[in-house]
Curated annotation (Swiss-Prot):
Cofactor (UniProt): Mn(2+)
Protein name in the entry: Phosphopentomutase
NCBIfam families referenced in this protein's UniProt entry, alphabetically: deoB (TIGR01696), PRK05362.1 (NF003766)
E.C. no: 5.4.2.7
Reactions accelerated catalytically: 2-deoxy-alpha-D-ribose 1-phosphate = 2-deoxy-D-ribose 5-phosphate; alpha-D-ribose 1-phosphate = D-ribose 5-phosphate
Main location: cytoplasm
Co-factor binding details: Binds 2 manganese ions.
Cystine residue pairs: none
Any one of the GO CC terms: cytosol
Keywords: Cytoplasm, Isomerase, Manganese, Metal-binding
Family affiliation: Belongs to the phosphopentomutase family.
Binding residues annotated for Mn(2+) 2, in chain numbering: D303, H308, H356
């Protein structure tokens, strides 16, 4: 039986990419810097000691990072019995954003430039916001700036609740984000507002509109809820997900995968929030998956909870939890199944600012007759999509080189 499981550790980079300097990210290293902080006792909040990832190490994580950076991360060495094939991949796409990374790993790199709102204050054109407000029947908005999603709630959450004005903000990514309180503004009202924004942003070539609902009574307890929704553009070409679906296969989205691909190539969507629930849902879908199925999960917490918030200890604790559950996944796989663990970009929690980092991503593959050992440096994330196409005997993708 042929089934593929893709476990996408959102933001888990393994060292500055070859073109990192262009992005101001030379020296970034999500995995390496987390390991270093743990080894030096600087990540002992909610956990303690060196970073411990025995199962990821057996799949080749430390070796992939060593090939990327030239040295083993602190606390890791060439002393494990490898069971997986490992490599590190350079992004071909022009950006270091979520859609670019996901689309490219499915065989469709983003070779055009996204639109961005580069001004840190007064970020959005008045013509754009006027149109959004008019269509939504609103008399104003808050924000209009680059911001951390948690900080802006502390600063503007109460005013939003008093005034009913939505919070518009952006970042270094190609995004337009809208934060609203679920209780006072309403979740469906937020979703409708995001749909309007998605339509009005068409001329600006913005990759995503993101609904950022939150709850709480004040700055001390404002918190994002699990009802985030991404409104992405459609990929510019057919991905390997589309091709498997067209061939009669199944593509199961766990978490935000369906949103990122604008539902293209998806046959089933499973909602789950948090590392535990996402892992539980992934296991459940693999247990019930039949022939010619992809189960594709985005573990977003690594990015949204730990990377952007520059929470090194939280990131380490999350990785150790993820690692502790990998034996459950390995036990479910048949001999012919293919497991791939990878990432879509970096988000080094020790780096300046709060944005993504341009890094190599790990490519860890297990099963399907693959021999344990190095896959080397991959020139594109699209090698993953090409390998999946080869595995399912689909028409080859335009980009990427199969490692199967």
């Amino acid at each position: 039986m042929k089934r593929t499981v893709i476990m996408m550790l959102d933001s888990f980079g393994v060292g500055a990419a070859g073109d990192a300097a262009k992005f101001g990210d030379l020296g970034s290293d999500t995995f390496g810097h987390i390991a270093k902080a743990c080894a030096e006792g600087e990540a002992d909040i909610g956990r303690e000691g060196p970073l411990t990832l025995p199962n990821l190490a057996r799949l080749g994580l430390a070796h992939a990072a060593m090939e990327s950076t030239g040295a083993f991360a602190p606390g890791f060495a060439d002393n494990v019995e490898l069971i997986g094939a490992y490599g590190h991949a350079q992004e071909l796409s022009s950006g270091k954003d979520t859609p670019s990374g996901h689309w490219e790993m499915a065989g469709v790199p983003v070779l055009f430039e996204w639109g961005y709102f580069s001004e840190h204050q007064n970020s959005f054109p008045k013509e754009l916001t006027d149109k959004i407000l008019a269509r939504a029947g609103l008399d104003g908005f808050l924000g209009n700036c680059h911001a951390s999603g948690t900080t802006i709630l502390e600063e503007l959450g109460e005013e939003h609740m008093r005034s009913g004005k939505p919070i518009f903000y952006t970042s270094a990514d190609s995004v337009f984000q809208i934060a609203c309180h679920e209780g006072t503004f309403g979740l469906e009202n937020l979703y409708r507002l995001c749909e309007i924004a998605r339509e009005e942003l068409e001329p600006y070539n913005i990759g995503r509109v993101i609904a950022r609902p939150f709850d709480g009574t004040g700055p001390s307890d404002f918190a994002r809820t699990g009802n985030r929704k991404d409104y992405s553009l459609e990929p510019p070409a057919k991905t390997v997900l589309d091709k498997l679906k067209a061939a009669g296969g199944e593509v199961v989205s766990v978490g935000k995968i369906a949103d990122i691909y604008a539902y293209c190539g998806i046959t089933k969507k499973v909602k789950a929030n948090g590392l535990e629930a996402l892992f539980d849902a992934t296991l459940a879908e693999v247990k019930s998956a039949g022939e010619n199925t992809i189960v594709f999960t985005n573990f977003v917490d690594f990015d949204s909870h730990y990377g952007h918030r520059r929470d090194v200890a939280g990131y380490a604790k999350g990785l150790e939890y993820f690692d502790s559950r990998l034996p459950e996944m390995l036990a479910l796989l048949d001999e012919d199944d293919l497991l791939i663990l990878t990432a879509d970009h970096g988000c080094d929690p020790t780096w300046q600012g709060t944005d993504h980092t341009r890094e190599y991503v790990p490519v860890l593959a297990y099963g399907a007759g693959l021999k344990a050992g190095s896959l080397g440096r991959r020139n594109s994330f699209a090698d993953i999509g090409q390998s999946i196409a080869s595995y399912f005997k689909l028409e080859p993708m335009e980009y990427g080189e199969s490692f199967i």
